[in-house]
């Protein structure tokens, strides 16, 4: 039934043709069940395991690798001779990588869909209904409830469907609907129509929503919506419809994959076409097909070389290390890619209660009457320190501490707060914090009494558990609570009837009252001044109400409670307590004692975090279910708004936002910093608008109502104290529910991205080198310098370890002084592309050069000519060009070993270059990242392992090297450091803002030797120089290769 909240009880009952006392007939139930179905959320049909596995192979890079593995497998099948076994290693390793990636992908997908299933926990199992087949109430399965059913609910029940209340059988009905609306306190319900058809859920006071809990009272109502038509069902539909966005990093890697696949395809085809003339060479037995297959194998090797197989594993490892660091800061990351996304967050949409605030209601101001003369009066105003439930703080007047027992009015005020109260403080030993037992408002009053200590109770030596209620206990020993007149909506107050524990002539029964100021003060005839009682005059009343209005609408927007007493109440037997309508009669002729103002105070550290966000170019938006006045007041206190800033067009309620045109709503999301009284649909809409501006949005939430927006935003952040639905729909969980933790996580995300850029570029330059190597050997007609199994080893193991260690690079000191990076910013800019292409070309040329050196110039090598090397495929006994050359020498493992050793060593030097994007190694020596030094040592150890430990040399088709050969490897490898240092110098001094270095030779003073050598690590210089001198002073016939 649409808009049931706007209809009268009679209209709703008439719509379903049902009587409240008898309920539906079985015939009606049957028809309604056929029409509306079961009252349950349908199980989401997830993807089958096979569909999930196939999905993992939709990535272009993965498909290319899979194709390369299949082709390698087919070619290995037809391989002959000694290479038969080793030929199968390559396809096997590639398939192993793909299977591992698929397992991780499937596991992540399965986790993502758990959020929808978690909604099931809010479905009640049973419900109590009236139906015509029985005279009394009956318990049935909640899934069998249909629209039109008359349902009975009582304290402790979970509401089984969306219900329009028809009658309340207790004084009040309180409902905890925080999981759905985000309201921090339970809500009082009534049965009157709410005429506004566009009312938000918070304002539908005559409705009960499926999945919410009854906190107090008993009532009956008629079911108006079941299953997917309930409010919680609508949330489920939103979550099903929400497609998970790919993170900026995933998008960048997708783009990189597409570009790389095109480049790979072109190079592979080019290599194959270049060598068409060699298809008929004698080495292939004169068979054109065998020649074509041989060069096809080289093209496959090229594809394997070009794909950074280790990249997924390194990224996963780096992100996992980041999550560990974040966990230490109370940010528990559920989705690994979101770690990097945090780094480009440009908007944080934060809930108010418990995130920006403590969610611990606290009394911060109070007043009592000081003097009254006719229509004029003066007040004693006090402020109270402490913003949590901890009974620690002091009462101050004019910023100076006061002793509360010196003011008679404060003693009576504390007595009312302690006795007109059903809540208490409790010390949780496991968490080490004080917690509320009962309502937040009443717990704030309990805490106030502890801070006031009006009877000077000795508190030293008490345990924290004893301290929790020490002062309240003293007051409760003086007076005994006989009965309570519960809160009701019409009078907006509650009271307790108390008698003294030790009766005497002077002490007598009293009624203590607390409630909304306007309701209580209207029923006050007198005011308490010290220990005397003075008549309330219109002027005094106006003064009191003006102060209360100022507190309620000023910068604090306090929630005010008036406290009063009835000095001569009726005796219990003279009261008729069965009917709550009589309560107001007994709460008249009251004496006003004082007023307290409370709020959910901001967390102490939030203001500095909001300031840090502003420095980092991140906009903070508060989105709350609370009212607008309170929300704006908190925004001012924490710095989202300035103290006197005009909030017109910067703060909206959900209703005001709905009334805007779509274009105005879009503009509102661009400028606003506060949204109050919002519903789940508003949060999702705000996220959509922000995403349309290319903003990267982090959204916080804790209730079921927040789940769709959490899932839709780039970073969903759930509270540690939130619901399972919110947690499973989110990417990150805040263990301490603290906004400052989000800011710390953003800082960590930025550092992780910077490090990730370094190792991605490091791996890419390595792959460029491998591609250049294979391309050069094919273009020059040289024998194979590297084979696929060696390339896999380098890409996965020897490169993988330093790349992972680069994730430990220290973050920049000014990382939070820069604006968020543009998520569309490429991983590799034009300059960086040139830089890594240049390095890659050197890596490729050096690798081929190392193999050529062995053939042409090495002692113990064949010393063939360049022509013979580049035409080795024409080598046979009757060819005069190869006279005296043993053709078997072109299949020697030595040149391949030289090429592999140079590739590995050069990559270790490249890892050192990647310590910083533009900072020189002379100023940032290797031990700045000790993990990198360790990983380089381990990678070189693994390289020695495959060189010197049998049977590994056979598998990798390599052989041990002697000292001269190793010196040659170092000679060829070390120049890559000098080359990158030159490129860094250019970037530092001509492409970025000039730093401290000597870059402006206009004045000689700025180019002094001391200025240019400032910050150089001399220990590193003294360590490296002797090594370089020794390497390059040793003769290895290097020059002979060029003379040849």
From Swiss-Prot:
Q: In which tissues is it expressed?
A: Isoform 2 is highly expressed in heart and slow twitch skeletal muscle. Isoform 2 is widely expressed.
Annotated compartments: Endoplasmic reticulum membrane; Sarcoplasmic reticulum membrane
What residues sit in the active site?
A: 351 (4-aspartylphosphate intermediate)
List of residues that carry Phosphothreonine: 441
Keywords on record? ATP-binding, Calcium, Calcium transport, Disulfide bond, Endoplasmic reticulum, Ion transport, Magnesium, Membrane, Metal-binding, Nitration, Nucleotide-binding, Phosphoprotein, Sarcoplasmic reticulum, Translocase, Transmembrane, Transmembrane helix, Transport
**Record function comment:** This magnesium-dependent enzyme catalyzes the hydrolysis of ATP coupled with the translocation of calcium from the cytosol to the sarcoplasmic reticulum lumen. Involved in autophagy in response to starvation. Upon interaction with VMP1 and activation, controls ER-isolation membrane contacts for autophagosome formation. Also modulates ER contacts with lipid droplets, mitochondria and endosomes. In coordination with FLVCR2 mediates heme-stimulated switching from mitochondrial ATP synthesis to thermogenesis.
The molecule here is called Sarcoplasmic/endoplasmic reticulum calcium ATPase 2
């Amino acid at each position: 039934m649409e808009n049931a909240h706007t209809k009268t009880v009679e209209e709703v009952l008439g719509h379903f043709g049902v009587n409240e006392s008898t309920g539906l007939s079985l015939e009606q139930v049957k028809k309604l069940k056929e029409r509306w179905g079961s009252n349950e959320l349908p199980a989401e049909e997830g993807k089958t395991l096979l569909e999930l596995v196939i999905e993992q192979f939709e990535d272009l890079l993965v498909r290319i690798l899979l194709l390369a593995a299949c082709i390698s497998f087919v070619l290995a099948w037809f391989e002959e001779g000694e290479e038969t076994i080793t030929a199968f290693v390559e396809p096997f390793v590639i398939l192993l990588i793909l299977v591992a990636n698929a397992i991780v992908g499937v596991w992540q997908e399965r986790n993502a869909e758990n959020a929808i299933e978690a909604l099931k926990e809010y479905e009640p199992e049973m419900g109590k209904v009236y139906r015509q087949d029985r005279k009394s109430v009956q318990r049935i399965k909640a899934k069998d409830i249909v629209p039109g059913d008359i349902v009975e609910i009582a304290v402790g029940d979970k509401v089984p469907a969306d219900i329009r209340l028809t009658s309340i059988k207790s004084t009040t009905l309180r409902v905890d609907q925080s999981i759905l609306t985000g309201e921090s306190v339970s809500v009082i319900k009534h049965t009157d129509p709410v005429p506004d058809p566009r009312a938000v859920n918070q304002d539908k006071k005559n409705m009960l929503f499926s999945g919410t809990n009854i906190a107090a009272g008993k009532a009956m109502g008629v079911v108006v919506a079941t299953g997917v038509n309930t409010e919680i069902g609508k949330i489920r539909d939103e979550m099903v419809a929400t497609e998970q966005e790919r993170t900026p990093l995933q998008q960048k890697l997708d783009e990189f994959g597409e570009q790389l696949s095109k480049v790979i395809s072109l190079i592979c085809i080019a290599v194959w076409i270049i060598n068409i003339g060699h298809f008929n060479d004698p080495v292939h037995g004169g068979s054109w097909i065998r020649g074509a297959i041989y060069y096809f194998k080289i093209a496959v090797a090229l594809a394997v070389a070009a794909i950074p197989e280790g990249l997924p594993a390194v990224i996963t490892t780096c992100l996992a290390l980041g999550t560990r660091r974040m966990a230490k800061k109370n940010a528990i990351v559920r989705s690994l890619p979101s770690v990097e996304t945090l780094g480009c967050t440009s908007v944080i949409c934060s809930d108010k209660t418990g995130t920006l605030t403590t969610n611990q209601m606290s009394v911060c101001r109070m007043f009592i009457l000081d003097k009254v003369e006719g229509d004029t009066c003066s007040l004693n105003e006090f402020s109270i320190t402490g913003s949590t439930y901890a009974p620690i703080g002091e009462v101050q007047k004019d910023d100076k501490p006061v002793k509360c027992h010196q003011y008679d009015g404060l003693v009576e005020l504390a007595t009312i707060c302690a006795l007109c109260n059903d809540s208490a403080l409790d010390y949780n030993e496991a968490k080490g914090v004080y917690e509320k037992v009962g309502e937040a408002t009443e717990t704030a009053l309990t805490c106030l009494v502890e801070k006031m200590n009006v009877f000077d109770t000795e508190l030293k030596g008490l345990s924290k558990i004893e301290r929790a209620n020490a002062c309240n206990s003293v007051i409760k020993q003086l007076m005994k609570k006989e009965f309570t007149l519960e809160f009701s909506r019409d009078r907006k107050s509650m009271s307790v009837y108390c008698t003294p524990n030790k009766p005497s002539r002077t002490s007598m029964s009293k009624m203590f009252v607390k409630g909304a100021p306007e309701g209580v003060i209207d029923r006050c005839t007198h005011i308490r001044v010290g220990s005397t009682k003075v008549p309330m005059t219109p002027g005094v009343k106006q003064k009191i109400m003006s102060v209360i209005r100022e507190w309620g609408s000023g910068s604090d927007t306090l929630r005010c409670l008036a406290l009063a007493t009835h000095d001569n109440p009726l005796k219990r037997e003279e009261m008729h307590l069965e009917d709550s309508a009589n309560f107001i009669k007994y709460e008249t002729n009251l004496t006003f004692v004082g007023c307290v103002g409370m709020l959910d105070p901001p967390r102490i550290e939030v203001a500095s975090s909001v300031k840090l966000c502003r420095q980092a170019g991140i906009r903070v938006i508060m989105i709350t279910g609370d009212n607008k006045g309170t929300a704006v007041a908190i925004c001012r206190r924490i710095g989202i708004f300035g103290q006197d800033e005009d909030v017109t067009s910067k703060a909206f309620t959900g209703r005001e936002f709905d009334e805007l045109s779509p274009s105005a709503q879009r503009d509102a999301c661009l400028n606003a910093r506060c949204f109050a009284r919002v519903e789940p649909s508003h949060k999702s809409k705000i996220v959509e608008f922000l995403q349309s501006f290319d903003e990267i949005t982090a959204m916080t939430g804790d209730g079921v109502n927040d789940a769709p927006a959490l899932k839709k935003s780039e970073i969903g952040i759930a509270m540690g104290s939130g619901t399972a639905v919110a947690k499973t729909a989110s990417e990150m969980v805040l263990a301490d529910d603290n906004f400052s933790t989000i800011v710390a996580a953003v800082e960590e995300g930025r550092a992780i991205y910077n490090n990730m850029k370094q190792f991605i570029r490091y791996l890419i330059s390595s792959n460029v080198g491998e591609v250049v190597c294979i391309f050069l050997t094919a273009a020059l007609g040289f024998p194979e310098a590297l084979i696929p199994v060696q390339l896999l080893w380098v890409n996965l193991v020897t490169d993988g370890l330093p790349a992972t260690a680069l994730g430990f690079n220290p973050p920049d000191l000014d990382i939070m002084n820069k604006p968020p990076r543009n998520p569309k910013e490429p991983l590799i800019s034009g300059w960086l592309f040139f830089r890594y292409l240049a390095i890659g070309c050197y890596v490729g040329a050096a690798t081929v050069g190392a193999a050529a050196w062995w053939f042409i110039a090495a002692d113990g090598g064949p010393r063939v000519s360049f022509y013979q090397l580049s035409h080795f495929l024409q080598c046979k006994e009757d060819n005069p060009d190869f006279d005296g050359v043993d053709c078997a020498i072109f299949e020697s493992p030595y040149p391949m070993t030289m090429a592999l050793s140079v590739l590995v060593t050069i990559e270790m030097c490249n890892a050192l270059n990647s310590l910083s994007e533009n900072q020189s190694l002379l100023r940032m020596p290797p031990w700045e990242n000790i993990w990198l030094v360790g990983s380089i040592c381990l990678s070189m150890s693994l390289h020695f392992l495959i060189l010197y430990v049998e049977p590994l040399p056979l598998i990798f088709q390599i052989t041990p090297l002697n000292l001269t050969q190793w010196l040659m490897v170092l000679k060829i490898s070390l120049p890559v450091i000098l080359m990158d240092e030159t490129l860094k110098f250019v970037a530092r001094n001509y492409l970025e803002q000039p730093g401290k270095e000597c870059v402006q030779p206009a004045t000689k003073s700025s180019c002094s030797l001391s200025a240019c050598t400032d910050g150089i690590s001399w220990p590193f210089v003294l360590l490296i120089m002797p090594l370089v001198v020794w390497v390059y002073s040793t003769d290895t016939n290097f020059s002979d290769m060029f003379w040849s």
